[in-house]
Amino acid sequence: LLSRRQRQMCIRDSKKHIIEKYNEKGYRDAVLVEDSVVNYNDKRVDIFLKVEEGDKYYLKDINFVGNTKYPTEQLLYILGMKPGDVYNQKKLNERLTTDEDAVSNLYYNNGYIFFGADPVEVDVENDSISLEVRIQEGPQATINRVIINGNDRLYEDIVRRELRTKPGMLFSRDDLMRSTREIAQMGHFDPENLVPQPIPDPDNGTVDIQYNLVSKANDQIEFSAGWGQTGVIGKLSLKFTNFSMKNLLNPSTYKGIIPQGEGQTLTLSGQTNGRYYQAYSISFMDPWFGGKRPNTLSVSAYFSKQTDISSNYLSNNSYG
């Protein structure tokens, strides 16, 4: 059951959403003029709302002012709203600022991080609204610093090679989001807490990019064991996802029992079916072989020994 305070908050949010829905349908003047809550029983209540809808409005005209980098025709095409459409304030905001292909992203992806768009109703006649979108383009911004916080698993250059945002480049929102996805796909950081933070500096026309990371362990251990007629039956597999081959012979750099920090994967596994069957394997994977491009190198080796119970025949197999 909801507490009295929770119920009041739920009712308040519901009333807000109702007005928003009216606005989406063109009723920009819709207001709640009366509401009441009546207990239906011990567990339920009835909510009565009185709404004044007002007139339904349509777009009479849309114009952009202040835009010098892109023509009005291009901005109108991206906006996707035209004279005669229902005046939908939510859609207007989404197409200007929040959608992935919004007008703002045309600017943000080309360095204009100081961009702003202010829709203004310049004329309201009967049920028709003339809209003027006032653009503040600002200068193009270059990236000054790229700051990485919270990384305690990888060498910093291992993280930086995944980034598409580098000092001296024009700011691009697409590059920022792609860099975020690339870091998340590495598997070493919590994607839910991975929120990049642009820090604009209008005085210098630059922007710092800050990535706040939360490390997470993703090594894997698999173990199973039992007993059968042939003896101990078991399997052990160890997967290290942050291995560092270059530090293999440098124990002073080890974190734990193995060298770590390059994001390489080392997998060791072995299994036995008593004295009649044994198998061992080792594999290594480097997602950035050579360190300059994301070229994957995979190497593996396998060894097995099997004895035929009936004939005591022994066979050894290995490959790499």
Residues covered by each model-derived region:
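A short, glycine/Asx- and small/polar-enriched loop/turn
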Residues: Y40-I47, V124-L131, P202-D208
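Extracytoplasmic/secreted envelope proteins and their assembly/folding machinery
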Residues: K15-I19, T72, L76-L79, N93-S104, ...
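Interfacial loop/beta elements and low-complexity acidic/Ser/Thr-rich segments
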Residues: N23-D46, V51-N63, Y87, Y112-V122, ...
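Gram-negative/organellar outer-membrane beta-barrel architecture
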Residues: R153, M169-G320
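Conserved "repeat-terminator" motif of extracellular CCP/Sushi domains
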Residues: I47-K56, E132-Q140, I209-K216
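Short, well-structured beta-strand/strand-turn elements
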Residues: N23-N39, N109-D123, M169-D174, R181, ...
